[in-house]
Amino acid sequence: MERQKRKADIEKGLQFIQSTLPLKQEEYEAFLLKLVQNLFAEGNDLFREKDYKQALVQYMEGLNVADYAASDQVALPRELLCKLHVNRAACYFTMGLYEKALEDSEKALGLDSESIRALFRKARALNELGRHKEAYECSSRCSLALPHDESVTQLGQELAQKLGLRVRKAYKRPQELETFSLLSNGTAAGVADQGTSNGLGSIDDIETDCYVDPRGSPALLPSTPTMPLFPHVLDLLAPLDSSRTLPSTDSLDDFSDGDVFGPELDTLLDSLSLVQGGLSGSGVPSELPQLIPVFPGGTPLLPPVVGGSIPVSSPLPPASFGLVMDPSKKLAASVLDALDPPGPTLDPLDLLPYSETRLDALDSFGSTRGSLDKPDSFMEETNSQDHRPPSGAQKPAPSPEPCMPNTALLIKNPLAATHEFKQACQLCYPKTGPRAGDYTYREGLEHKCKRDILLGRLRSSEDQTWKRIRPRPTKTSFVGSYYLCKDMINKQDCKYGDNCTFAYHQEEIDVWTEERKGTLNRDLLFDPLGGVKRGSLTIAKLLKEHQGIFTFLCEICFDSKPRIISKGTKDSPSVCSNLAAKHSFYNNKCLVHIVRSTSLKYSKIRQFQEHFQFDVCRHEVRYGCLREDSCHFAHSFIELKVWLLQQYSGMTHEDIVQESKKYWQQMEAHAGKASSSMGAPRTHGPSTFDLQMKFVCGQCWRNGQVVEPDKDLKYCSAKARHCWTKERRVLLVMSKAKRKWVSVRPLPSIRNFPQQYDLCIHAQNGRKCQYVGNCSFAHSPEERDMWTFMKENKILDMQQTYDMWLKKHNPGKPGEGTPISSREGEKQIQMPTDYADIMMGYHCWLCGKNSNSKKQWQQHIQSEKHKEKVFTSDSDASGWAFRFPMGEFRLCDRLQKGKACPDGDKCRCAHGQEELNEWLDRREVLKQKLAKARKDMLLCPRDDDFGKYNFLLQEDGDLAGATPEAPAAAATATTGE
């Protein structure tokens, strides 16, 4: 109960400091001290439970609140800040972040140079970083202070061996000296005091004593877990109830030991008068509305399936928002109608502007009878001698006005400012002609609309007709930008109709792009609850829409930095497959959704909690959420839908995995039936490919040589003797037009075939393809014909195509070429067995690739393609309206003088305020991406060269005097996070 109360106090306290409610300076200082002490104590409990990640969150929150207090001229005791740094260093060290642990240890020593624990943490961190000489110096000081501590002794011996020093035997003083109390003022007593000052026996433990001498600050209260600190302050954050009274002061009996005298007693009595007397003349409103909108349980306005238990997005940031947010830039959110709307950029984390609907939505949760313009409503005459509850407890809270539940905050619509959307059906939006785009909207038609068609139009477009937005094509592995259909551009009829995977108009491109990024869900545009009905969401439907599988992975490995993929082994399923750690798999497993296409994507599905919000985190979508598991929002659409599924069905994670296995067993059965009928040749396409073909060595082909394998099919016949494997060979086809060999790549997707294969626009123009991934457009007419032949005959493997050609042209020589039995068949539908090889190793979520060893991982994170992924994404082309920043973040001098800029798009300065604002926003996004990549250890710690992106990461002060040669000069500059 005591810990639950402390958690509630922390939650309320964090919400209170994010508001702008007034408070006396003395009470405010004591309130901040109590909040930091609670965070310190909660972090200690989590550390003892070995939940180091959450303990780190509490310590960081406590230090963040301390920084916020310092910015408000409130100084907290240095002893408490020192212990926070020491314990946070312990968390960092346990998690393997030795640089961070060293930094915190040095900060703690800056606050208290005599802190032995801080010195010990520093020594251990230096030891792990390979700085053994410095570590030995720190360890020696610890050994002199605590010569009998096992942890100190062990560390000293380890460092001595590494430095090649001789470990001498320690001197023991005669025991008779202690027996006859001859060491009353000697070192023995001092050692005992230091070793057990916090109630623990080893210096390797964390600091736990958070009691602070009240003489260090005139407005500080002693830390006692049983005495509530300013209940009238914390109660401002809870719904008012007429039955609530001020807690009694029975817990003061704890001070009956008579140890409080002098100034301590005066300070204690002053603080008690504050608690008992309430806020005399303070800013406590007589009728204060709730700061957090809460739906009454069981309201009939919500669907009966979900009831009133779905939490609503709060206008206040979550409890741990200060973890990644500057305290001086906190967003003050309240239901008081005197608030002005926030500016376009509130903080680097709030780069997505708040829409007007988010602020207006607060008005529907009840009206306020007073405002900041009426200071009299905030004054309440109270008698400091009366033990009566505050005025808010005497009067019942005003009942909220009857209104519809405000679910506007659940609607994630990033296109609200530029697009309009409407629902329709076949009756009000019928097809009026034979062509693909012949539809007309009948406005004002009286009928019962099914609302199963999404219509949209651009607000700024001259064409204000409603256009149908088809469902996004998901049966394709294409990951590039969407393009308009060539037939629709030429105002011709598209022969593929609704099956065309190209967009029919710009509105369709915009919606599809946002849907793929995860920032828009058409099901939530008009129904925030997503039309949740019993049976509408099933695991089979989720897997059919999102592909992939659900499985369990080791959560400790998955959350580690860098991310490690491991699951239970067959030999010992109770232990994870990470041989270096061998975590208990049953106690640390987590549900993960895995999709394997051109890359690997792992989406962690957290266990649904009541305080979670049914919305996708905007930070995760844009550059990765730094709060990770402590975030209250979903980090993917698949996680959001699983939460909805759990909300109404009560399914557990084990049930989800079992349903996933059943679904794939059914798919395997269907795939087996389909494969049995693939033996006969198809009647709708040619049975063989007429062009001459052969396999050659891929490495030799890149050097311009056509080299076939040897007779044993183990090596190529060149002098280099390259290994002959499926991955290192290339299929060549003789071009009749060019009369030379042309390489043919494997099918870009073996799961979903497009209607037709088109030539790559770069290859058509005789240029090299600029696409980073596996381009799904053919790079030659021969490649297009080969892919079309394979699609029509349901041939999924290049080897199978070659075997069919070889059988026709060399029927009497079946032994020539690569034998049919050596091919590795591929299945049209990926089964769970296809994921067996991706269940272990390091994982890079930026590139979607796994590495099997540390060496391979280091090579990957140092590659240029990987660094490019840190700063780019598939949505960059459609997410920005202006040029890429050219080097200088200021307006062009020529344009400011009204002259034309001769450099045009090559000008290094911005051509307008809007372009400059976008450049500044883009720089902040890139900084956040870099911070996320560094936090996840996707970059080498000392890697500070990012090529053309270096000038974007300079500080504002450096940019003010930037010269036109800034990008070149910045090639060796250190990036700033």
Curated annotation (Swiss-Prot):
Zinc finger (C2H2-type): 842-866
Protein name, as recorded: Zinc finger CCCH domain-containing protein 7B
TPR repeats (start-end): 1-27, 36-69, 82-115
Entry-annotated residues carrying Phosphoserine: S217, S364, S367
Zinc finger (C3H1-type): 484-508, 616-638, 754-782, 886-914
GO molecular-function terms, A-Z: miRNA binding; RNA binding; zinc ion binding
GO BP terms, alphabetized: miRNA processing; post-transcriptional regulation of gene expression
Stretches the record annotates as Disordered: 365-403
PROSITE patterns reported for this sequence: TPR (PS50005), TPR_REGION (PS50293), ZF_C3H1 (PS50103)
Gene Ontology CC terms: nucleus
Any Pfam family: TPR_8
Organism annotation: Homo sapiens
Subcellular location as annotated: Nucleus
Quaternary structure, from the entry: (Microbial infection) Interacts (via LD motif) with rotavirus A NSP3 (via the coiled-coil region).
Keywords of this entry: Host-virus interaction, Metal-binding, Nucleus, Phosphoprotein, Repeat, TPR repeat, Zinc, Zinc-finger
Motif (LD motif): 248-256
Function (record text): May be a specific regulator of miRNA biogenesis. Binds to microRNAs MIR7-1, MIR16-2 and MIR29A hairpins recognizing the 'ATA(A/T)' motif in the apical loop.
